[in-house]
């Protein structure tokens, strides 16, 4: 395979484009209904009324903007739909080659009172998706990368794909003064194990187990596409620090023989993202890397059993071990459960039935046996399935209310300390017995006071000390909280946070309703790409230095951060500061290296490379600023610093961040602006609404928010990838009653990256949520299917096969029936396409019926453009920003 890059022939993007187009059908998968589109196209040519005409699937003709008009029912007539403004013309983003050209501005001066005239996040996202629908994003091309919510195909040409790394601006200020003048925070967000589309080229793997990867002798940066050859190509100059290195030092010279053959055959000199397989010099204490071991640790106390958790967990584990996606054949698993004791299962393939042995010592947990504890799930399939079959019955009569969570976490350490690996722990109640026992400290009287932040910090250092031991041993843990009462996520969850794992919090868990979501979350947690025994370090050009890392990890030194495990759905934010001046004649270079062990037991280094232009003008930095990374960096800084301040202080700093950026823009563009206007740079047109969404998030907003919910969201914000964070802040809302005949169906002429025609979303405001409508709401963590109380019975029948909202059980998981209607096919196709685009997200929608379900409050919290008791509406927030700009004197 030829890798396009900096040297010689860059490869043929057209060939790659054709290969991608040829793979679209396979990417769509069997869940996308392609039959309907062909059937509808064929019927267009059949004379109406012909006896030969086939019977089409039932479809409703659109009336006005509605596919299901309320005039067909006896209910009150629906209000006239609020029409969104037309999609604006394509953005003309400035490019690094012409950084002095200012972006076009958005002025809202003419009609401030019209909500439809405000910048629309759905329209900007839709336009960006259409821009990249039929073209490949080449990483060395000029222009801005696709938005995180855009489904696109990336083609690496030296720089890593924006799926792996994004910068707040692609014009790096040469000095600290220029950076401050721009108002743009200088940072990047790296997602080293980001998942690629099946039709994208996988990350190349270079085998250096016998000879180490070539590295700079001075800064220890890894060889990459941006090095320069010197001295008749026998030496190379490091693009990070400028030092000269010899190829012979590493037994590596790509230019032996012809230059074309040598460089083109080396992926590390052509693509931005690379994996190096490394040898014993990269081992930990000369300990050979071992295949991962997975531990499923299940709470079976009374609270868990009464909620049906053992049954849900057993079904989820069965699907993981014997479902459609096989585990790495080298991985071994153990199943352990706990109530007041820790119960171990011997799953040896030589047994006919699993053997259980309980260890009830609360002060000194131990592992009572080793043989048969970790097993090959295929070799032990019979005995494992017998355990899973009987698992719910074994503990159905358990009446023990206190789970020894601390003992269970200590046992995880004992099980994995020699090999490293990953644990998946289910917790249903506050641990009040055994190691790490905690007290109930939730106190609503603290809400809104200076002492509320105490609820967000750990109450017992035992858990943070355990997390330190986890990281040392290469252990990561994901914790699934299914409690219906206070469980102290801040303390218990710190083990997951510091080890690089994840917190899953299911507030008011109901097995029938939330079980499908939990199963999908656990499946993703186990099967996504991940590594363990992880260390990460970012290097950058002379003149810059790393000032801070943000995320969920353990940091023992200023230079490196460590994880017990790191997976595809985690990001790390890197903030930079100046220790000198960048050379404006050269690019700024950045490299993140991640040392890790794969689940199969290979020691590797994943390297992510990127270069940006350097500028001495602040308006270049503003012109090439990208709104999503800016918002993400500001949100992650806020979620990290909030424990040292207050909710009010955090909100003030976020608003000040927006004002600083916009006031900087007014300074550099003063000669092009009309005094008194509120003007937004077009590339930052979504900055106010996204920051408003941060202010209204359950992580940051004031009000009576349970500390478990707030803490889980704060820690989610710190480590969430940009894509997930953006959808958490501003969801995609699909009006199902307005789907057009071609929406959510395959386009026979579509040669791009989308398997179906995606509809335009509606804005997150009650003004755009129509009476009688049905809406699919997709956030970064959860999805909802919301029905207005006057939803058409015809829609309910075509989508769910029911006659009324009362026929729907909202406490059970939604399973869309396969109906012979156009709407059924459209919605099932839509969900299938979204699951492929957002594999980390739980897309088993929770049904919410207006006026009938208590969870309706969750729906309203997603409508971030509206006024609430705790925050401004969109228009009022823009007014506040405008006033702040005038207060500072920028008129």
From Swiss-Prot:
Residues 215-241 are annotated as: Zinc finger-like. It comes from the Eukaryota. Keywords: Protein transport, Transport. InterPro entries: ADF-H/Gelsolin-like_dom_sf (IPR029006), Gelsolin-like_dom (IPR007123), Gelsolin-like_dom_sf (IPR036180), Sec23/24_helical_dom (IPR006900), Sec23/24_helical_dom_sf (IPR036175), Sec23/24_trunk_dom (IPR006896), Sec23_24_beta_S (IPR012990), SEC23_SEC24_subfamily (IPR050550). One of its GO terms (cellular component) is COPII vesicle coat. It holds the Pfam family zf-Sec23_Sec24. One of its GO terms (molecular function) is SNARE binding. One of its GO terms (biological process) is COPII-coated vesicle cargo loading. Belongs to the SEC23/SEC24 family. SEC24 subfamily. This is Uncharacterized protein C4.03c. It comes from Schizosaccharomyces pombe (strain 972 / ATCC 24843) (Fission yeast).
